[in-house]
């Protein structure tokens, strides 16, 4: 039996109502707070939302089988910031709770839980500023978030909650890292395989080494070097985004379009550092192709497709002479999607960071060099050094979109493989090292950027596709090949095939598919993150720790601040905070060849590590033997082709969160999941079967003449002006619309709304504001509408003056109420299942208004009980309370949800608007099953229609069944 704070006339009334005109038993904020607190305690005490697993500690104690009809609902978990929640944060959480509660009521076994993404830079920055340890601050923030979220009455299985900073959680993050580290991608099988199988192939001779080397004759170090080249996790001297102001490197996705850090807005520079990388590029095809089987917003799929960026083309080799004394020949590998234009390539451009640049730089300028090509340098080397310094702070986007074309001639030439002609080699910032090969063949006649560059530097422009006027601009359309030797007269597709065949036969090129996607930079020079399960020997060679050595716990250190540099110091070098923990760093270990000294890796994993697999831990959060039992993953996430079709990849049934994670978390988690799938650890090919992106709640903010924000709640609207009552009198302020935030002084805490109206009111208001996917403006003044709706529902059941239940038993419903009820049941059921909570709310309000008008005294139980049931997913606390007061003894959390009777979904009569020459002139009501001839007769004999016709006979009578009748005269 559940307990109620208000049941019966003896329930506790509002404490401040003794001398008030407010009825003693009205639904008020104070009453809402009491019943919400009580029902939340009841749910927690009874384990109402605890959901069973097939096996393990959360399996049914009696060994009973779990229901087959399961549903896994997941939110993108929050980062527990120090500012706490504002009213925009719960939008998606409320929506998924309504969804989960509805399906729980109709009998499905629903898993819904919420954890915290607690590692990362913000906590570390705050700790450095305040002197508070990141763990202390993070744990306090989690407590506050749990309190705030708890007030909203979410039906989460609290046993499954965790933080990514929990040692029991990040132990398995480290374990998954080791699985990826100890795997390689077999391009023949198109999947990851254990490194042990690669070693076995080398040992047996099934796989040969490059250069004909004998595996058996390699030293242990040489074998390790070979294997490291195959691993899915590897170290490389990579071109990285170095942010001196943060003291760490950043992934491409963490750098803004204007070349600054998305956290802190510091300058970011490109430089080479030895870093851990994950070979996500091996999965580019699968990541791209499997988007087709996902039920995701097309916008997100398009963003991932563009980020992966598959291009079909060819590689051509341009030979050149190195500038060293021996002048050895090097091949410059160029990727192009237009091999048909190779005869029009009149110069090459390398990215300034390209590996071959320094080898190809001439000692001096050739005689007669065009001054435009020299960048004002006395030698090519001086010019290139100056140019590199000038572009160091530019973002990739700036480099590609800059209208001014800049570059430097290397003083050397390459040979065009199509015609044997020498072409000058330049570097320019519009070519990126991270795309293709980092080198392009420039065809100014048919590429506008190349045309602009050629015009700026006085380079030749050759037409090889007929159809344009290349003296005015590049021609990028279709046409016939010209000035291209054996390709002349061919179409573009035919020329592509012919030139690729010629390049392949000459050993100077081949067809190839390229991707924009780059390998994932997987190391940060920070403290607050997961330590790597890696140690280094005295030679600096990395060694993975055994799984038995996990977890590698993050040490508590007195100095956890990163070494920060002048934000503009591009030449600075990272120094991780963990390097200061010398006792932790230096360890003696036996890794199979005796006790030896090792040093731990002092980098930490990026913030995305924990979120790359956390959905799996929800399925089995207490398992100490595996990250999750296979049976539990298969039950909650395994493919269900009978339900979702033959191509079902499996995964979480519904995942809700922001679209801003499209090419970060969502791409990384897909990569990790696919590796785990390949290695046999999971049965699902994808982590998230269905994705929904919620919109944002936005609000007005106000700035004074200096651009400083003022508290939005104190701003007064006067006509078309806004004023702020400052300490020196009123000042005019200016309105802007956008994000909610503490710094914008327009933040509203959910605590404020819960205190003023109750949590159910907040839930109803946020769900009624519009479609889930759409952004919407917050208006505190409008919250009262949801509050009054719940008060009307309360009055249908409870007498506000006596506290008695006021429903009428044994009263049959009239036909209008029956139709209204069953239409509402159908509509609300469909809306809840489709996440259309705004229209579900509107239908519930409409039905409530019908009952309020129809039944001034007692409402029939048969009419109001279904309303309470339908309200339960949306406003669960008041629904539970009313359900109890209606005489029920069990919680509504597991149903029942009312079912519609189809007999009441059909109208007995239909009203037809009658148009005369397209304008409505009357209306007739006929039986729903009236045939067309009878309908026409009823229209023509209607008094209003006859009066308008004034004796005229219509030339034509047009009937649109169920909608209208049109008379043409």
Curated annotation (Swiss-Prot):
Keywords associated with the record: Acetylation, Aminoacyl-tRNA synthetase, ATP-binding, Cytoplasm, Ligase, Nucleotide-binding, Protein biosynthesis
UniProt GO molecular function: aminoacyl-tRNA deacylase activity; ATP binding; leucine-tRNA ligase activity
Binding locations of ATP: 742
Pfam families the record matches: Anticodon_1, tRNA-synt_1_2, tRNA-synt_1g
A single BP term in Gene Ontology: leucyl-tRNA aminoacylation
Domain of life: Bacteria
Transmembrane region(s): none
Reaction equations catalysed: tRNA(Leu) + L-leucine + ATP = L-leucyl-tRNA(Leu) + AMP + diphosphate
Motif placement: 'KMSKS' region: 739-743
Gene: leuS
EC number assigned by the record: 6.1.1.4
Compartments where found: Cytoplasm
One GO cellular component term: cytosol
Residues bearing the modification N-acetylthreonine: 2
UniProt motif 'HIGH' region: location: 78-89
Gene3D superfamilies: HUPs, Isoleucyl-tRNA Synthetase, Domain 1, Valyl/Leucyl/Isoleucyl-tRNA synthetase, editing domain
Signal peptide feature range: none
Name of the protein described by the UniProt record: Leucine--tRNA ligase
Organism of provenance: Mycobacterium tuberculosis (strain ATCC 25618 / H37Rv)
Family annotation (InterPro entries): aa-tRNA-synth_I_CS (IPR001412), Leu-tRNA-ligase (IPR002302), Leu_tRNA-synth_edit (IPR025709), M/V/L/I-tRNA-synth_anticd-bd (IPR013155), Methionyl/Leucyl_tRNA_Synth (IPR015413), Rossmann-like_a/b/a_fold (IPR014729), tRNAsynth_Ia_anticodon-bd (IPR009080), Val/Leu/Ile-tRNA-synth_edit (IPR009008)
Family: Belongs to the class-I aminoacyl-tRNA synthetase family.
């Amino acid at each position: 039996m559940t307990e109620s704070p208000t049941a019966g006339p003896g329930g506790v009334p509002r404490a401040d109502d003794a001398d008030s005109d407010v009825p003693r038993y009205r639904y008020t904020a104070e009453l809402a707070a009491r019943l919400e607190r009580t029902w939340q305690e009841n749910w927690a005490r009874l384990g109402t939302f605890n959901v069973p697993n097939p096996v393990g500690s959360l399996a049914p104690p009696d060994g009973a089988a779990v229901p087959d009809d399961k549903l896994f609902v997941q939110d993108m978990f929050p980062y527990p910031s120090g500012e706490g929640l504002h009213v925009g944060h719960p939008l998606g959480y409320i929506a998924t709770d309504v969804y989960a509660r509805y399906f729980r009521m109709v009998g499905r076994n629903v898993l819904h839980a919420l954890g915290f993404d607690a590692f990362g830079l913000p906590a570390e920055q705050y700790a450095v500023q305040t002197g508070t340890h990141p763990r202390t601050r993070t744990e306090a923030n989690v407590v506050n978030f749990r309190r705030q979220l708890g007030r909203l009455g979410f039906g989460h299985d609290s046993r499954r909650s965790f933080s990514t900073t929990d040692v029991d959680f990040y132990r398995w993050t480290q374990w998954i890292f080791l699985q990826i580290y100890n795997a390689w991608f077999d391009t023949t099988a198109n999947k990851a395989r254990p490194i042990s199988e690669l070693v076995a192939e080398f040992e047996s001779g099934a796989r040969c080494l490059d250069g004909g080397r004998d595996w058996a004759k390699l030293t242990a170090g040489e074998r390790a070097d070979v294997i490291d080249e195959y691993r899915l996790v590897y170290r490389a001297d990579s071109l990285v985004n170095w942010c001196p102001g943060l003291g760490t490197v950043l992934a491409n996705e963490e750098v803004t379009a204007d070349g600054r850090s998305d956290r802190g807005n510091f300058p970011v520079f490109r430089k080479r550092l030895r870093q851990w990388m994950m070979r996500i590029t091996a999965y580019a095809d699968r990541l791209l192709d499997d988007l087709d089987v996902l039920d995701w917003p097309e916008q997100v799929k398009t963003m991932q497709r563009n980020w992966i960026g598959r291009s079909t083309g060819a590689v051509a080799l341009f030979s050149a002479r190195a500038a060293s004394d021996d002048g050895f020949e090097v091949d410059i590998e160029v990727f192009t999607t237009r091999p048909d234009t190779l005869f029009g390539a009149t110069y090459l451009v390398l990215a300034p960071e390209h590996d071959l640049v320094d080898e190809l730089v001439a000692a001096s300028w050739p005689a007669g060099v065009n001054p435009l090509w020299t960048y004002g340098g006395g030698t090519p080397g001086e010019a290139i050094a100056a140019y590199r310094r000038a572009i160091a702070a530019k973002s990739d986007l700036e480099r590609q979109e800059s209208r001014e074309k800049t570059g430097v001639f290397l003083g050397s030439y390459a040979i065009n493989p199509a015609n044997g002609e020498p072409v000058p080699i330049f570097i320019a910032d519009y070519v990126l090292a991270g795309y293709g090969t980092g080198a392009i063949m420039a065809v100014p006649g048919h590429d506008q950027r190349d045309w602009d560059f050629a015009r700026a530097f006085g380079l030749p422009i050759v037409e090889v596709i007929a159809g344009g006027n290349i003296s005015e601009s590049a021609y990028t359309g279709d046409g016939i090949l010209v000035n291209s030797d054996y390709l002349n007269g061919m179409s573009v597709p035919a020329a592509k095939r012919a030139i690729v065949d010629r390049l392949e036969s000459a050993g100077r090129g081949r067809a190839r598919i390229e991707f924009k996607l780059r390998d994932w930079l997987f190391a940060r020079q920070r403290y607050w993150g997961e330590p790597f399960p890696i140690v280094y020997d005295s030679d600096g060679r990395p060694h993975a720790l055994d799984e038995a050595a996990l977890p590698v716990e993050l040490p508590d250190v007195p100095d956890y601040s990163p070494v920060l540099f002048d934000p503009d110091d591009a030449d600075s070098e990272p120094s991780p905070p963990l390097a200061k923990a010398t006792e932790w760093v230096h360890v003696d270990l036996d890794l199979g060849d005796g006790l030896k000294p090792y040093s731990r890796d002092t980098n930490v994993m990026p913030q995305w590590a924990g979120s790359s697999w956390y959905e799996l831990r929800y399925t089995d959060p207490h398992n100490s033997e595996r990250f999750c039992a296979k049976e539990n993953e298969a039950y909650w996430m395994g493919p269900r082709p009978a339900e979702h079709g033959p191509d079902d990849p499996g995964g979480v049934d519904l995942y809700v969160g922001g679209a801003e994670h499209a090419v970060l978390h969502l791409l990384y988690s897909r990569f990790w999941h696919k590796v785990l799938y390949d290695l046999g650890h999971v049965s699902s090919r994808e982590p998230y079967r269905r994705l929904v992106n919620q919109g944002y709640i936005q609000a007005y903010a106000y700035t004074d003449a200096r651009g400083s924000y003022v508290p939005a709640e104190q701003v007064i609207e006067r006509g078309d002006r806004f004023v702020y009552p400052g300490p020196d009198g009123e000042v005019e302020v200016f309105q802007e619309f956008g994000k909610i935030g503490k710094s914008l002084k327009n933040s509203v805490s959910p605590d404020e709304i819960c205190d003023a109206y109750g949590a159910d009111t907040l839930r109803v208001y946020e769900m009624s504001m519009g479609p889930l996917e759409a952004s919407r403006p917050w208006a505190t003044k409008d919250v009262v509408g949801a509050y009054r709706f719940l008060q009307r529902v309360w009055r249908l059941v409870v007498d506000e003056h006596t506290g008695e239940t006021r429903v009428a038993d044994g009263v049959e419903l009239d036909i209008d109420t029956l139709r209204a009820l069953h239409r509402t049941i159908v509509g609300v059921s469909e809306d809840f299942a489709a996440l259309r909570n705004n229209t579900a709310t509107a239908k519930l309000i409409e039905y409530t208004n019908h009952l309020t008008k129809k039944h001034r005294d007692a409402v029939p139980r048969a009419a109001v009980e279904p309303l309470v049931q339908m309200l339960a997913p949306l406003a669960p606390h008041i629904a539970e309370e009313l359900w109890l007061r209606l005489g029920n003894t069990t919680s509504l959390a597991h149903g029942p949800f009312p079912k519609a009777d189809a007999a009441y979904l059909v109208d007995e009569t239909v009203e037809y608007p009658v148009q005369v020459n397209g304008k409505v002139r009357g209306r007739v009501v006929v039986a729903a099953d009236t045939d067309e001839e009878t309908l026409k007769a009823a229209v023509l004999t209607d008094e209003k229609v006859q009066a308008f016709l004034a004796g005229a006979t219509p030339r034509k009578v047009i009937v649109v069944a169920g909608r209208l009748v049109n008379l043409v005269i």
